[in-house]
Amino acid sequence: MNNEAVVEESISKPKSSKLKIAMIIGMLVVLICGYMVYSFNNNYMYNGKIANNVFVEDVNISLMTKEEAIALVNQNYKTEALSLIYNGKTFKILPEDIDLKYNVEEVVNSAYNYTKTDSYFENVKRLFQLEKANQNFTLENSFDEAKLSESLESIAEKINVPVKNAKLYISGGSFNVTPSTTGKEFDVGANKESIYEAINSRKYGEVSLKVNDINPKISTSMAKSVDTLLAQHSTTFSTSIAGRAENIKVSSNRISDVLLMPGEVYSYNNLTGIRTIANGYYNAPVIVNGDLEDAPGGGVCQTSTTLYNAVLYSGLKVEQVKNHSITSSYAPRGKDAMVNDSGSDLKFSNPYDHPIYVKSIVNGGTLTCQIYGNSADKPNVDIRIDTFPMGAKTYRIFKDASGNKIKTEYITTSVYKK
């Protein structure tokens, strides 16, 4: 019995020793692993530095603090001034003018946190991946669009040149031309695109500006092409009726010195304006429903009629004309042109390849309307009036230089109450 107890005791002692040894070894393994993890974390993950083999663009920021990395990237990637070139002049836009900058801090923060995510195992995975391949982060630039627009507007003001049409003034048979000026216009859209491209490609050197030429509607040569009198017509009026005489002067002045380009339409009413006292007209006799009564603007129809006859003989295209309700004292039937503020207007257009010039002159009690143009456009015209009991039909006959009829053009039919 005692011998058996001794045997059991001798058997249990080796087992207990092995267990103790295993426990000691296990504790050592845990301690070593813990130390390795602690050391790994301190040296690689939570050491306050960026992991190895991390780049921003082509700048190696491995094992740097964020502050060190930001300083190094800023040193290598600086925004520069834009030099905008036009006609030998340079216009500078500085980075601070438009808040132009790279997102360096944002990118460095991303690089720093690349191995510092919320997942420990993801961080370990990334660290091991970095031993095989680099991790590259890309910079992006930004700028204030509104400030760029302001800078370009300021430059445009220094470059833009207003376009100026040539001006023609005829007086006493003398032709005086003020030359035209070609305008210059800064192309905002195209120049913005060029600047975007320079910024995005990081080529901050010189940017050629696009400036467009703006041609005048009326060039000097066009104005100078008016070189002769095509036709003119005169009527007389009494200066003793002061209001009427003044209205003729006012309307004559407003329709005069107008250069009409090829295809353009001339409107008598648009030029003379509404007939009111406030608009500079005087009370004078006017025809209303076949009777005479005083109203502002009396007499302006004599101006429109005088101009109409000059238009007929100059070969211009009659677009709109209407006769009076009664035969006027200053023009035969078929040759008068009534205007009012209710839509009756005298309109004509320029059918020629050159401009025409309208001149109206009052000299004492005589009103003269003249149409000037190019000598090549001077027509040979007769006006034919076919009368009937209550009116007349107006025709224009075009002839060649030898007096041979080229064509007959119907103009209008006029009907009168009396």
Regions found by a protein language model. Give the residues of each.
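Hydrophobic membrane-insertion alpha-helices, especially the h-region
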Residues: 24-38
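Aromatic-capped interface at the extracytoplasmic side
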Residues: 37-51
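Glycine- and acidic
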Residues: 17-22, 133-135, 286-294
